[in-house]
């Protein structure tokens, strides 16, 4: 039985990804210096609010995030701040939908919560590979992340190519300070 190779070995020159040397180096540095995937931790009851970050535009993972919230949060009297792609799957729940007609960044979503509750403790709900950035962003703006709940899936048919697989996500995240997700998807032919 063969083991899965480390992520950085998935980006070798002969792969389907057409990456120049600088891009491969950037990816290797990102993989070596970043927490790629998080697991759930902490006690929800220690937070003053729950903030749920969507993952992609499709229903696939966002519906799973909504179901996770429904199963994990029932019984707690804690305000729910849900990004619109998750909120649409929870019409019966009492929540605050974080809506916007244009693309919302992780920081945009966290900023709405901060504006509403101030510097308080929160539980983050996110996709496992997106979770570290959600935690870092919340902490950077003054929200104290005391708990995390995750879904570990990728939406294979999402309109955003960078969320369709672990490899696509890592390529995008390793270049996020220089290109948008759409630019990275086009440049490296993410599918």
Predicted feature residues:
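A structural signal for short, hydrophobic/glycine-enriched beta-strand patches
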Residues: 5-170
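C-terminal capping/extension of enzyme domains
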Residues: 156-191
């Amino acid at each position: 039985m063969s083991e899965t190779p480390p992520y950085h070995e998935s980006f070798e020159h002969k792969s389907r990804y057409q990456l120049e040397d600088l891009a491969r180096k950037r990816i290797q540095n990102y993989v070596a210096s970043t927490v790629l995937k998080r697991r759930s931790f902490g006690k929800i009851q220690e937070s003053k609010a729950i903030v749920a970050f969507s993952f992609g535009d499709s229903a696939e993972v966002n519906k799973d995030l909504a179901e996770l919230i429904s199963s994990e949060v029932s019984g707690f009297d804690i305000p729910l701040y849900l990004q619109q792609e998750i909120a649409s799957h929870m019409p019966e729940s009492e929540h605050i939908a974080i809506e916007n007609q244009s693309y919302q960044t992780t920081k945009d979503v966290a900023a709405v919560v901060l504006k509403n509750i101030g510097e308080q403790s929160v539980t983050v709900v996110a996709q496992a590979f997106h979770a570290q950035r959600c935690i870092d962003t919340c902490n950077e703006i003054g929200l104290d992340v005391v708990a995390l709940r995750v879904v570990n899936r990728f939406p294979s048919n999402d309109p955003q190519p960078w969320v369709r697989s672990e490899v696509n996500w890592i390529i995008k995240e390793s270049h996020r300070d220089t290109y948008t997700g759409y630019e990275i998807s086009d440049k490296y032919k993410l599918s």
